[in-house]
Amino acid sequence: MIIDRNVWIVRPLPHGVNRMNEFLDEDIIAIGFPTGKSFENFSSDDLKKILASHGWDEGFKTANLFVKYLNKNDIVVVPDNNKRDIYFGIIDTKYFHKPDKDVPYENLYPHQRKVKWLFDKKPFLRSDLPDEIRGSLRYPGTIANITKHREFIENIINLENTNTTTETSLKSLAVTQLKDLLTSQNEEIRIRAIELVMKHNL
């Protein structure tokens, strides 16, 4: 599903190395694949060929999504590899290439986008998120589209403009947002919200 504003899981693990701290410090999300070239003007076929020439055939989907489908103003949900913390951000730029990170065998991350991290770069707890979102976070790939959860996630990130902080339990926030979803225009979301309210006696 690709619409006007998408929500993406982006894992901070280029070449299997946890770069969550670097992502936060440098205000970025990024992927690896140091080929010595920017992917900006590559067609999908060109991208597939250059990755294959370096033995990264399985990385095509990740690179293609990152370069061609993520967009400025999309929401990113970035789960730290500690399986506890979740960070929220807004993509702030188009794709760009960092030559100084394009070093073979260093497990770096040359293909980047700038991100505005929300909530002063403080994490939410994975355990406080609704079951449906936690289920999506179990997807093992580097990048996944979870726009089906956009309404709920936008309600969370809108807290950035209130006095609410991450010290407030997301469980209590989830109750408020869930009740708001009872009036959603989307019938499937509305029915699911009713089921959850009844299940948890909210």
PLM regions and their residue ranges:
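Amphipathic alpha-helical protein-protein interaction segments
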Residues: 172-202
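Structured alpha/beta reader/binder surfaces that contact nucleic acids or chromatin modification marks
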Residues: 37-110
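Short, cationic low-complexity segments
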Residues: 32-37, 137-146
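Boundary/linker segments flanking structured domains
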Residues: 9, 158-163, 170, 190-192
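Long, charge-rich alpha-helical interaction segments
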Residues: 140-165
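Aromatic- and Lys/Arg-enriched surface recognition patch
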Residues: 83-84, 90-143
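Alpha-helix boundary/N-cap detector
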Residues: 57-61, 144, 165-169, 173, ...
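Compositionally biased, charged N-terminal/linker segments
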Residues: 1-62
